């Protein structure tokens, strides 16, 4: 038996293609012919088969469809073989008089197997075209076909095969397949099948085919598969539903041969091979686009219907926001290009010898390539826009961009400044929609603004300039893009507002020549939208520059209390813009887009100052609502679109979500301060069950949905999604922990509203209605929403935009913002079909008791009709009923008011009466319960009877906030007052223990809360340390910065448990017993503000001299973090020293990020996205410089405080670990511990007496945490909890600390080995184990 035929897999062929692509011109590297003896080509050597040495390619390479890589002695073998056969060699292909075969340069299926069907994108459309660029004579073509057939049929095929080699037989088969295609009618099923089976080989032939009128395809290279982000598009194009559309396009293009001559001429201008194009002279060369975009095949054939839809999409969906192009100029060149009306001067090497048409237009070669490249850029952008509908049937957008970049490369350095601005701006609009890092956007727009400012001086107005209108359009378009990108990535502006002296648009400047004639003369939507957008952007730029919100070094930014008047002033400017904006003058889609711009500006203004406001403050609620509106708008967009994203949108959604989380943590800290001022000794404050809480959770759900959808569409969003997910884990874990038995609840009693003067700069009734509901507390936010909605009715009468707090929830929310997605992006017929399917699903799967919760068809229409009014009928009715109910507050109950807190809000008598009524009813119920159940009073220390005078003596009032004569800003209470606007409003609370303080399954929830927070803490700190490393590498650590730094692969020094982060470790827990004060009595611990250890009491020299060298390393990241000893930090510490030791309302910005990273968290466990972020320009540089940096660090600090509290809490450890699995029992017995610890202490010259004291001291566990051996190995706190009793570590200790003794080092590694169970529980959860172990879901791991 002979050897079986060798089957070569397509994977090996594809692998060889990729090797050829990477090798480029260095194919000798692949040959590896060191001695120069090889005569076979690369493929035949790899297959170990005989090569026939044909030119220009051997038969095996032709069949495989790859480039024939030939050694130096390949030609000698060919010359010997040519003496024995008649096959032509290189350059011997004679010119043929028959019509040439024109193939469209679409996706090449070079590597496809002969028996494998390719996609429609890979089809080669065959059309007969003569050499004179004229129509093919059908009679001549048929006569030629008959002649060829007669020759082939009259001869004996067996005799012919004896005289022919495989090369000739292969070419004859290709010729027969082409003739078969000519006989078939285009569009039929057989034609499509034959076309899909055809494999191109002409790109492997010689370049000396000068008689062909079509361009030679030798510049085509072996192309890899598209990127993963484009695979959904490729799959959609391969569906059977696209066959008809593709065949229709094929037939249309076949019948329109006369209009394709310009395309042939365009392709002939790109006749040079790809490797000969000098991309270093291209205007895009500096942005590293060659490697990512030039690997795709260009497109030269143009479908008229699809291309015209591209232009219409661009000028309807982008031109009104960024009027960069002249619409008439684009359409004129497109018409010339499509109908072959372009004439290249004779000096051009690509000039056709045929006579030009009579109506042709002359273009120079540079001008032609510029206009062509610009047009193909528009096509690529529009292709991405059309992909959002899910109905796009064209080529992938990167292929249009590949054509554009080849045209632009031909221009070289001959582009003027205006052309450079247009091309670079279009490049920004394209890259925004690709899976690219945002840093490249800032680099491009910075160059564009530099050209506009320094070269063309577009920022100055010259009315006598004949091109003044075009320059105005160019600059404002670049300005809007530059402002949007700078805010998204957190980079400083490239041009100041003071340098801009330009008017807004009018009809003459906005509309281009010839287009405005068809536009309406009054109420032009385009001018109205672009002018309002410019006004809002200029207000935003003013407060960004004044408040210095965007700086090169974000750590130098100072947000102080003194800036709050400026914040209120700029917010007033935004309010003036909002009220003056008329929603009736613009389309619904443009109106919703401006809403997004407004919400984005409000969030950007208030977010850095959130910690200075109370949660009930107007600005706090506006910022929180604006962030929620942003998340909801983007959720609606992704809900109604199937594809599409933008990198600035990823930043916007992420920062909005982090802002919402930050607001929840600030509200928690504020409630903790209120509770502790009342003398409550509980550990936590129960979260208030309010409408605001559930509204925020709904907005966070929308943000999470958006980030997950964006990650599915773009790999760039993965880091943002994972970071937000860890923040949510920490937040939810903290909410669970606060609902435990050791927590107290704040009960809002009443608010006595003082009379106030009318606020200044408020002239309309709408603003009065808005400002009247400012003091509504979270516990009664439902009434607040009703009142604000009822009063916001006045807004719709003057056509102004509603504020961010005027929101619609539930069924009407999606319909309210439905206009955010343009109608062209939504298929109405498909929507109706989807609604019918949804109705069937409701009937079959949804229980009848829940069916009423879903939005019905009639409800949708009713809601959409009333969408212009910003309230629903239910909210208005509830607000009217609530406003009509008024009750007097009894004097006996006024004695029960526990705390007076001044709010800087504008009060409303109706709202306060409603709250008094609601809380009056609740208070009466509480009194009845207290009278009936005396045991509740004895068990609840914080629930005091109404007639108890001792409770009144314990009530506290913040006197510093009661100064109504001056404008006072008190940080600890986050309260502001302005004398000319408002009067102090006193909200009164009591503290009450919950009645259901013992839950049967609380231990499970407590364990979940702890593990969830601890895992989130580790992951957050890993993200912060790894993503921000590149930004700090250029900074040299100072002397002071080396104090508190630790190796990134070891356990850094933790932040104090309940104190604000300090630039030094918690030294009170590092020293032996004789230098640490005893735990404070209970009476003194109730006033912990007198015993906070100041970090500035320690001497840097003493600290550094006493610590081991291996304990602290010079990590440049943490060095830069802890070295920021500014006056702001000192002032912040002074303020915090005089107040509470609870979790601060704002962690020190200069002393952030790294608190503790587990030792097990090495570089091997860091996610791939994080590792990639460390190399080069990554999203880590911009992830934390756009406003989220400060918030993430503070949240990480507060989460770390909760985790350290849990680690030092005996009750929690007993809950998490049963008696048989306590950390102490997991390691060794007590005698072994004492023996080992005595040996360690004797080695370090520590007496046995001191050791016995330190062993029983709770701070000894902290000492072990800071210990390190000679190899620099550090141990985490949780690794040492087993070595001693689990006693509470007091966070608030006061002592004069001295560094007299050197801390002993740990040299035994057995502790870490025996702590594996503890570490496994702390670093992983059961969910991860399920996905790892379960075989059914193994494909997900």
From Swiss-Prot:
Gene3D superfamilies: Zn(2)-C6 fungal-type DNA-binding domain. Residues 72-100, 770-804, 864-971, 1031-1116, 1220-1240 are annotated as: Disordered. The modification Phosphoserine is found at residue 1143. CDD domains: fungal_TF_MHR, GAL4. PROSITE patterns: ZN2_CY6_FUNGAL_1, ZN2_CY6_FUNGAL_2. GO terms for biological process: DNA-templated transcription; positive regulation of transcription by RNA polymerase II. It comes from the Eukaryota. It is found in: Nucleus. Residues 1057-1076, 1091-1116, 1220-1230 have a biased composition (Polar residues). Keywords: DNA-binding, Metal-binding, Nucleus, Phosphoprotein, Transcription, Transcription regulation, Zinc. One of its GO terms (molecular function) is sequence-specific DNA binding. GO terms for cellular component: nucleus. Residues 72-93, 779-791, 864-906, 920-967, 1036-1050, 1078-1090 have a biased composition (Low complexity). Its main location: nucleus. The keyword Disulfide bond does not apply. Disulfide bonds: none annotated. Residues 41-68 bind DNA. Present with 1080 molecules/cell in log phase SD medium. This is Uncharacterized transcriptional regulatory protein YLR278C.
């Amino acid at each position: 038996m002979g050897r079986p035929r060798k089957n070569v897999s397509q994977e090996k062929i594809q692998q060889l293609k990729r090797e050829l692509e990477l090798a480029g011109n260095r194919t000798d590297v692949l040959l590896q012919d060191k001695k120069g003896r090889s005569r076979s080509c690369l493929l035949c050597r790899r297959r170990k088969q005989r090569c026939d040495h044909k030119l220009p390619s051997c038969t095996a390479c032709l069949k495989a469809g790859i480039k024939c890589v030939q050694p130096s002695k390949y030609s000698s073998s060919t010359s010997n073989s040519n003496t024995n056969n008649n096959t032509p060699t290189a350059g011997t292909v004679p010119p043929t008089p028959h019509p040439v075969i024109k193939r469209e340069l679409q996706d090449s299926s070079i590597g496809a197997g002969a028996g494998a069907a390719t996609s429609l994108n890979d089809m080669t459309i065959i059309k007969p075209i003569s050499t004179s660029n004229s129509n093919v004579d059908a009679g001549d073509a048929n006569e030629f076909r008959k002649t060829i057939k007669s020759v082939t049929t009259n001869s004996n095929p067996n005799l012919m095969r004896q005289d022919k080699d495989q090369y000739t037989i292969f070419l004859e088969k290709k010729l027969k397949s082409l003739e078969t295609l000519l006989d078939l009618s285009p569009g039929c099923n057989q034609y499509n099948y034959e076309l899909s089976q055809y494999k191109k080989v002409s790109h492997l032939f010689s370049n000396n085919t000068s008689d062909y009128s079509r361009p030679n395809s030798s510049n085509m290279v072996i192309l890899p598969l598209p990127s993963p982000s484009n695979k959904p598009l490729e799959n959609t194009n391969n569906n059977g539903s696209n066959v008809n559309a593709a065949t229709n396009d094929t037939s249309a293009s076949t019948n329109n041969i006369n209009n394709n001559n310009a395309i042939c001429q365009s392709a002939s201008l790109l006749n040079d091979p790809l490797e000969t194009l000098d991309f270093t002279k291209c205007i895009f060369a500096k942005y590293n686009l060659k490697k990512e975009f030039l690997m795709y095949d260009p497109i030269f054939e143009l479908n008229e219907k699809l291309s015209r839809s591209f232009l219409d999409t661009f000028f309807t969906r982008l031109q009104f926001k960024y009027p960069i192009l002249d619409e008439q100029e684009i359409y004129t060149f497109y018409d010339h290009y499509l109908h072959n009306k372009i004439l290249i001067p004779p000096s051009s090497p690509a000039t056709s010898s045929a006579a030009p048409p009579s109506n042709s237009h002359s273009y120079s070669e540079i001008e032609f390539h510029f206009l062509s490249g610009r047009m193909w850029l528009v096509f690529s952008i529009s292709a991405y826009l059309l992909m959002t509908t899910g109905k796009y049937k064209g080529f992938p957008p990167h292929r249009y961009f590949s054509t554009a970049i080849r045209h632009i490369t031909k221009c070289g350095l001959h582009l003027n400044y205006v052309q450079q601005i247009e091309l670079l701006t279009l490049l920004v609009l394209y890259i925004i929609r690709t899976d690219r890092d945002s840093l490249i956007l800032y680099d491009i727009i910075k160059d564009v603004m530099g050209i506009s400012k320094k070269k063309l001086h577009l920022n100055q107005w010259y009315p006598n300039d004949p091109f003044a209108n075009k320059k105005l359009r160019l600059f404002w378009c670049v300005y809007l893009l530059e402002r949007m990108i700078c805010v998204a990535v957190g980079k400083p502006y490239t041009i100041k507002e003071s340098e801009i002296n330009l008017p807004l648009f009018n009809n003459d400047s906005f509309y281009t020549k010839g287009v405005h004639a068809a536009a309406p003369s009054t109420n032009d939507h385009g001018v109205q939208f672009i002018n309002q957008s410019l006004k809002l952007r200029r207000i935003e730029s003013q407060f960004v520059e004044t408040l210095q919100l965007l700086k090169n070094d974000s750590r130098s930014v100072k947000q102080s209390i003194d800036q709050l008047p400026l914040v209120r002033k700029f917010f007033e400017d935004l309010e003036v813009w909002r009220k003056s904006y008329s929603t009736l003058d613009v389309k619904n889609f443009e109106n919703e887009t401006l809403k997004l711009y407004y919400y984005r500006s409000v969030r950007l203004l208030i977010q850095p100052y959130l910690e200075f406001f109370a949660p009930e403050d107007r600005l706090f609620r506006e910022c929180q609502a604006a962030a929620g509106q942003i998340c909801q708008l983007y959720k609606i967009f992704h809900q109604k679109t199937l594809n599409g994203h933008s990198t600035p949108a990823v930043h916007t959604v992420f920062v909005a979500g982090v802002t919402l989380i930050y607001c929840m943590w600030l509200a928690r800290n504020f409630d903790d301060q209120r509770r502790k001022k009342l003398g409550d000794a509980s550990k936590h404050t129960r979260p208030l069950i309010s409408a605001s809480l559930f509204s925020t959770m709904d907005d966070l759900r929308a943000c999470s949905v958006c980030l997950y959808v964006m990650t599915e569409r773009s790999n760039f969003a993965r880091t943002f999604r994972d970071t937000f997910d860890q923040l949510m884990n920490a937040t939810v874990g903290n909410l669970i922990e606060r609902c435990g038995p050791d927590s107290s609840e704040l009960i809002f009693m009443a608010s006595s509203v003082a009379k106030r003067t009318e606020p200044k700069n408020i002239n309309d009734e709408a603003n009065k209605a808005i400002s009247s509901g400012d003091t509504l507390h979270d516990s009664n936010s439902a009434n607040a929403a009703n009142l604000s909605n009822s009063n916001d009715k006045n807004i719709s009468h003057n056509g102004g935009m509603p504020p961010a707090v005027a929101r619609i929830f539930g069924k009407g929310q999606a319909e309210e913002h439905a206009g955010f997605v343009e109608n062209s992006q939504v298929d109405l017929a498909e929507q109706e079909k989807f609604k019918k399917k949804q109705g069937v699903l409701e009937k079959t799967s949804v229980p009848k008791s829940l069916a009423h919760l879903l939005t019905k068809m009639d409800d949708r229409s009713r809601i959409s009709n009333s969408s212009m009014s910003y309230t629903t009928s239910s909210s208005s009715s509830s607000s009217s009923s609530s406003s009509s109910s008024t009750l007097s507050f009894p004097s006996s109950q006024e004695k029960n008011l526990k705390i007076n807190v001044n709010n800087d809000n504008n009060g409303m008598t109706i709202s306060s009466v409603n709250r008094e009524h609601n809380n009056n009813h609740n208070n009466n119920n509480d009194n009845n319960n207290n009278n009936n159940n005396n045991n509740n009073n004895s068990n609840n220390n914080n629930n005091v009877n109404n007639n108890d005078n001792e409770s009144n003596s314990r009530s506290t009032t913040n006197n510093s906030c009661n100064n109504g004569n001056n404008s006072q800003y008190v940080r600890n209470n986050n309260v502001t007052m302005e004398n000319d606007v408002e009067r102090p409003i006193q909200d009164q609370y009591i503290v009450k223990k919950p009645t259901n303080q013992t839950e049967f399954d609380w231990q499970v929830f407590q364990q979940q809360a702890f593990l969830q927070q601890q895992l989130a803490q580790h992951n957050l700190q890993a993200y912060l340390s790894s993503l921000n490393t590149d930004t700090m590498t250029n900074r040299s650590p100072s002397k002071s910065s080396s104090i508190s730094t630790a190796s990134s692969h070891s356990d850094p020094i933790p932040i104090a448990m309940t104190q604000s982060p300090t630039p030094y470790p918690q030294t009170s827990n590092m020293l032996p017993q004789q230098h640490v004060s005893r735990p404070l009595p209970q009476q003194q611990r109730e006033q912990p503000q007198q015993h906070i250890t100041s970090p500035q009491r320690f001497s840097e020299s003493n600290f550094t001299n006493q610590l081991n060298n291996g304990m602290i390393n010079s990590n440049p990241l943490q060095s830069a973090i802890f070295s920021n000893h500014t006056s702001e930090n000192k002032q912040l510490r002074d303020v915090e020293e005089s107040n509470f030791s609870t979790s601060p309302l704002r962690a020190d910005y200069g002393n952030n990020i790294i608190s503790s990273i587990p030792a097990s968290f090495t570089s091997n466990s860091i996610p791939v996205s994080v590792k990639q972020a460390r190399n080069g320009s990554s999203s880590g540089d911009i992830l934390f410089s756009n406003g989220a940096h400060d918030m993430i660090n503070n949240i990480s600090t507060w989460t770390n405080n909760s985790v350290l509290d849990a680690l030092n809490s005996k009750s929690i450890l007993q809950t998490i670990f049963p008696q048989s699995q306590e950390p102490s029992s997991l390691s060794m017995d007590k005698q072994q511990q004492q023996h080992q610890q005595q040996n360690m202490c004797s080695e370090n010259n520590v007496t046995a007496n001191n050791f016995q004291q330190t062993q029983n001291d709770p701070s000894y566990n902290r000492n072990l945490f800071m210990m390190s051996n000679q190899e620099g190995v550090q141990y985490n706190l949780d690794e040492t909890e087993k070595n001693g009793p689990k006693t509470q570590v007091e966070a608030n200790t006061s002592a004069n600390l001295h560094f007299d003794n050197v801390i002993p080092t740990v040299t035994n590694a057995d502790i870490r080995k025996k702590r594996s169970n503890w570490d496994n529980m702390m670093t992983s959860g059961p969910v991860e184990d399920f996905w790892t172990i379960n075989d059914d879901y193994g494909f997900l791991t």
